UniProtKB/Swiss-Prot annotation:
Biological process (GO), any one: dUMP biosynthetic process
Cofactor entry: Mg(2+)
Biochemical pathway: Pyrimidine metabolism; dUMP biosynthesis; dUMP from dCTP (dUTP route): step 2/2
Cross-referenced InterPro entries: dUTPase, dUTPase-like, dUTPase-like_sf, dUTPase_trimeric
Name assigned to this protein: Deoxyuridine 5'-triphosphate nucleotidohydrolase
Species per Swiss-Prot/TrEMBL record: Ralstonia pickettii (strain 12J)
EC number: 3.6.1.23
Function: This enzyme is involved in nucleotide metabolism: it produces dUMP, the immediate precursor of thymidine nucleotides and it decreases the intracellular concentration of dUTP so that uracil cannot be incorporated into DNA.
Length: 148
């Protein structure tokens, strides 16, 4: 798949988003901030990535996901938990960054902050019914299938 990318921050020309390994599912997104940014515990910041994408094909969407090390080691996660980028969106990708930790975190310019994953999408056609055919699970939820 080819992905149309518009570079909005010239610094990205030297550090284009890339897959870290051949098995990586996500492209690393960088923090296009001009100076180190201190993210205090409990606060959120909207961080520009310096790029825009256009998927164009309604059969795809993009997800902005946290990098595992940022959340586990530093408490830095996404303020919206997952960012959903629709196929027709063409604006700059922004990362809602939340410090859920107990200490301040300094985000440096061009630091890898999140990852972008392209996923297939199926748009469902709603079929209104009065009843469902019975299934083994039925309406059981929230732990109804057991713990182990």
């Amino acid at each position: 798949m080819k992905l149309d990318v518009k570079i909005l921050d010239a610094r990205l020309h030297e550090q284009l988003p890339q897959y870290a390994t051949t098995g990586s599912a996500g492209l690393d997104l960088r923090a296009c901030v001009d100076a180190p940014l201190t993210i205090e515990p409990g606060t959120t910041h909207l961080i520009p990535t310096g790029m825009a994408i256009h998927l164009a094909d309604p059969g795809y969407a993009a997800l902005i996901l946290p990098r595992s090390g940022m959340g586990h080691k530093h408490g830095i996660v996404l303020g919206n938990l997952v960012g959903l980028i629709d196929s027709d969106y063409q604006g700059q990708l922004m990362v809602s960054t939340w410090n859920r930790g107990s200490t301040a975190f300094v985000l440096n310019p061009m630091e890898r902050l999140a990852q972008l994953v392209i996923v297939p999408v199926v748009q469902a056609e709603l079929n209104i019914v009065d009843d469902f055919a019975e299934s083994e699970r039925g309406a059981g939820g929230f732990g109804s299938t057991g713990r182990h």
